[in-house]
């Protein structure tokens, strides 16, 4: 009887099927931020934790600022999973200062992006790196071998799904009849890894390299902006310019060569759509759309609290496949 009890106890401890916690990290409260992070944590550890977002449902998290009271409340949780490339890094610092026992996982550890933060998850390869960061960090906090084994198996499933998604993108875009899309911002350049030409009509601050005869008055007249505004923006005290110096003009313009290229493609009937990550776009793109009867196609970047999901059947994978279908509208027309 005693041997049987010891055997059953061993099974309970190894499998996690006990009447008590088999690990301090089991049945914990985890706070995440945006949908891409929530999806990873839920996929890897959702069976063993209650997962929340620090943001209330329905708010615009880009404009929403957590109160000190909320930060202190979240700091009392067991684990905060965040993206150090975003404002969440500041929240993590405040929380750990409030509670030194709070465990942290940085999903973007060791990662960077070229154009926009959304590249970290819209590129399936990058997203897999984020998943590995979560998996490895959970493994550092968890001692129960059964839980670690479950996380590893969940990661293998995620790895398969993301690798398959990346392969689908590669195959579909490689077979596309047309290899160029037009977008209203640089974010879409993440598609260049699939050998797709992305012409961006993003408005950027004008950056000038000063030539020998340049003056601030000339620059002011050319861009219809006051000298004082240019001085203030560049933290300059006087109008003295040095050859080779870089000056920023605080107005946003689209690169003329890109705009002319798009106009040429439109005149040749090669462009029917302009891609955006928003339902609104800049005035130049809007004018192009109105004048040439083009369509603005909104790409779901998943950069929100719920990822733009409209029902429980939608996930990161289904939305990424829907985005691929949107790309095919232009590339396979």
PLM regions: where:
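Extracytoplasmic metal-acquisition and chelation regions
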Residues: 17-209, 222, 229, 245-333
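LysM (lysin motif) carbohydrate-binding repeats in extracellular/periplasmic proteins that recognize
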Residues: 211-245
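Sec-dependent N-terminal signal peptides of Gram-positive bacterial secreted proteins and lipoproteins
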Residues: 1-22
